[in-house]
Regions:
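A short beta-sheet element
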Residues: 70-111
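A short glycine-rich beta-alpha junction/loop motif
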Residues: 87-92, 126-153
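Sequence-specific dsDNA recognition surfaces
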Residues: 4-18, 33-63
């Protein structure tokens, strides 16, 4: 089933100029720097507080939304689960909001990050002034398989376990590097 048949897709907040942080701001802005392509995650501790000029088309992010990075060399999606109130996505994102109860957000987020989708996007995406850009129509036309909810749940759980495993391997590699570096430094300093 086409993505636009199971979800609504909205562009991120488009500003008429530079966004300036303001302590008295009414909204927070999630930007590209706030998401991680490696971990497929996001952080909210450094969101910019600002005062937008909202239109009726702007969506505040909510749990279950999927942020899709539409600009740049690497397109990926991140599932939103917890976040503060009044958070807008920046213009570099599309916000994908499920409108069909036959699909789980976790499953859709996972599927949009798979290599067949990456290849499809490379083939059909356009080029912006300075970088590749995924057009909304291209994103909307992605075919999404709809297995039973039980299967979607299983796929989502396996993906969560895989992410945890990858995070543990990275932490282990960092600790090993620090240990071996320490051993080598100690050996070079105590060569007498």
């Amino acid at each position: 089933m086409k993505l636009n048949k199971i979800a609504k897709i909205q562009s991120g907040y488009i500003s008429r100029g530079r966004i300036y942080p303001r302590e008295d701001g009414t909204c927070l802005l999630m930007q590209a720097k706030d998401v991680s392509a490696d971990h497929l995650s996001y952080r909210t501790d450094a969101l910019v507080r600002f005062r937008p000029t909202l239109s009726g088309k702007d969506w505040f992010l909510k749990p279950g939304d999927i942020l899709f990075m539409a600009r740049g060399a690497r397109n990926f999606s991140v599932l939103i689960d917890k976040l503060p109130d009044n958070v807008l996505a920046a213009a570099c994102f599309f916000v994908v909001r499920i409108s069909n109860f036959e699909i789980l957000p976790e499953y859709l987020g996972w599927y949009l990050n798979q290599s067949p989708i990456e290849e499809y996007l490379k083939r059909f995406s356009g080029r912006g002034v300075h970088m590749p850009v995924v057009k909304r129509a291209v994103l909307e036309s992605i075919d999404i398989p709809l297995p039973p909810i039980k299967t979607q749940t299983q796929v989502s759980e396996i993906n969560k376990l895989l992410q945890k495993e990858q995070d543990l391997y990275k932490k282990l590699a960092e600790k090993r590097k620090n240990l071996l570096t320490g051993i080598c430094l100690k050996a070079t300093l105590n060569h007498d």
